Every structure is written in structure tokens, then in C-alpha cells.
UniProtKB/Swiss-Prot annotation:
Database matches in Pfam families: Peptidase_M48
InterPro entries per UniProt: HtpX_protease, Pept_M48_protease_HtpX, Peptidase_M48
Cofactor(s) the protein requires to work: Zn(2+)
Transmembrane in keyword set: yes
Compartment(s): Cell inner membrane
Species this chain originates from: Ralstonia pickettii (strain 12J)
Name of the molecule in the record: Protease HtpX homolog
Length: 286
């Protein structure tokens, strides 16, 4: 129930951003059009955003024949978690990373890059996929997929406001500086909405993944290795669609400044420390 409340609040907050930007572009008429657009986007995001994200990353579905060891690993972990078998995808990218998507456990998918399969041991990879299945178990995947889709749409709409100008509430041409401000601040506002739900969600998925796999130390080792390797390997699809970065087990984006300030992922060192404490004491710290 709490996840449905979070989903509703996320949709409401991002819809409000759409309306504000619509008002900047076209006054009252723009606000109404933006509201209709936001409602349409919410509907689309619920039903189709998982397919869109998988297409963005050119993810290829695999099965027990094409990737037997990886597929059976996910199958075994899904059984341990009491989940239906998700669809399994591989992404031909060198950067080690993984994510889960879908609107519910019955329509879930997990995806991993070829890079993560190449650098992790079987035990570490098992920890990563258990983490992704924990997102499915906690029903986080709908929230993360919707927020990624809607945040991308907000950025596009804000850029539209800059290039095509706008109208105030009386229908007069809007201040162009205000349009530029919207283009800068609207994506940041969308990122902050994502941050409000993403960081705590990653800690919970670490705890849940360690419980599913029964091996918190393996996930800690995997996070350390992914963090070190990912920093030196660009991920073109993620850079092209930065709003989807919060879906990944590790931030795939490069660069400093705002990219780090508004990171939707908690510090890797803290994630590892919590998992190591769980390995030693059997309890994940609050």
C-alpha cells in the first residue's frame, strides 16, 4: 500500500511540474494542455514505460537456451524470493551495470550489461541479480520506471519552452529569461523528486538482495568492483537518457558537479559498510 501512495505522490508532483511549464509556454491554455499531456504520460508510463526503457538500451531478451547459466541464476533467485520468473535481458555494453523494470512482479524484467557478466564472479553476479529482484519484490520498479519516463518528458518540455517562447496568464509574450530559468530548474526539480524516493530504495534493495541471496558480502564485493570499473567506462545509452540513471544498481553517468550533487544513488562506501555489518552481525543497520 505504501508503494502505491509513493507512486501517486510521484505522479502528482510531476504532473504539477508539467502544469507549471505549460503555463510558462501558453498561459492558461498551456496549463490545460499540459495537464492533459501529463495525464496521458501517466497512463503511457504505467502501461508501456518498461518497454520503452528496454528499447532505449537496446536490451535483448535471453532464455535458457541463449544464456543458460545467467537465466538459471535469475530463475533460482526468483524462486528463493517467491517471485514469478521475470523476463531476462542482456545489454551489449562494456560498463558493468544492471536494472529492473516493469509495472508489477507479474510483468517484471531484469537486465544486465555484458560488462557486468564479464567482470563479476558468479557469486557476485548472484548478489547483484538478487538486489534487482528485491526491487521487484518491494514493487519499486513501477516507481523508478515512471519517474525516469516522466523526468525525461519534463526536460523535453522545458527545452521546448526555451526554443519556442511562451505566454503569461494574460496571453502576452513571456519573459525569455523566465523560460531559460524553467529549462534549468524544471529538470533539477524532477531530479530532486527522484532523489526523494531513490536513495532509501537502494538501501532497502541492498538489504533485500542480501536476504534473498543469503550472501551480503558477495553484494558488497560486487558493488566495490562495479564502482571501480564503471568510473572508467562510459555508458552511451545512459548518457543519452540520464533520467533513467536512477534505475541502475550503480550511477552510470560520468562527470562531476551537478551530476554528483543530484545523484539518485547513495554513496557506494556507505552501501558496502552496511552490507558488511549485515554479514558480521546478521542485522542490516537502520
Amino acid at each position: 500500500m505504501f508503494n502505491w501512495i509513493k507512486t501517486f505522490m510521484l505522479m502528482a508532483a510531476i504532473t504539477a511540474l508539467f502544469i507549471v511549464i505549460g503555463g510558462m509556454i501558453g498561459g492558461r491554455s498551456g496549463m490545460m494542455l499540459a495537464l492533459l499531456f501529463a495525464l496521458g504520460m501517466n497512463f503511457f508510463s504505467y502501461w508501456f514505460s518498461d518497454k520503452m526503457v528496454l528499447r532505449m538500451y537496446n536490451a535483448q531478451e535471453v532464455n535458457e537456451t541463449s544464456a543458460p547459466q545467467f537465466y538459471r541464476m535469475v530463475q533460482e533467485l526468483a524462486g528463493r524470493a517467491g517471485l514469478p520468473m521475470p523476463r531476462v535481458y542482456l545489454i551489449d555494453e562494456a560498463q558493468p551495470n544492471a536494472f529492473a523494470t516493469g509495472r508489477n512482479p507479474e510483468h517484471a524484467a531484469v537486465a544486465a550489461t555484458t560488462g557486468i557478466l564479464n567482470i563479476l564472479s558468479e557469486r557476485e553476479l548472484r548478489g547483484v541479480m538478487a538486489h534487482e529482484l528485491a526491487h521487484v519484490q518491494h514493487r519499486d520498479i513501477l516507481i523508478s520506471t515512471i519517474s525516469a519516463t516522466m523526468a525525461g518528458a519534463i526536460s523535453a518540455l522545458a527545452n521546448f519552452a526555451v526554443f519556442f517562447g511562451g505566454r503569461d496568464s494574460e496571453g502576452r509574450p513571456a519573459n525569455p529569461i523566465a523560460g531559460i530559468a524553467v529549462a534549468i530548474l524544471a529538470p533539477l526539480a524532477a531530479a530532486m523528486i527522484q532523489m526523494a524516493i531513490s536513495r532509501a530504495r537502494e538501501f532497502e534493495a541492498d538489504r533485500g538482495g542480501a536476504t534473498i541471496s543469503g550472501d551480503p558480502q558477495a553484494l558488497a564485493s560486487a558493488l566495490d568492483k562495479i564502482h571501480r570499473y564503471a568510473a572508467g567506462i562510459p555508458f552511451a545509452a545512459a548518457e543519452a537518457h540520464p533520467a533513467t540513471a536512477q534505475m541502475m544498481i550503480m550511477n552510470p553517468l560520468h562527470g562531476g558537479g551537478l551530476a554528483n550533487l543530484f545523484s539518485t544513488h547513495p554513496a557506494t562506501e556507505e552501501r558496502i559498510a552496511r552490507l558488511m555489518q549485515m554479514a558480521q552481525t546478521g542485522q542490516y543497520p537502520a
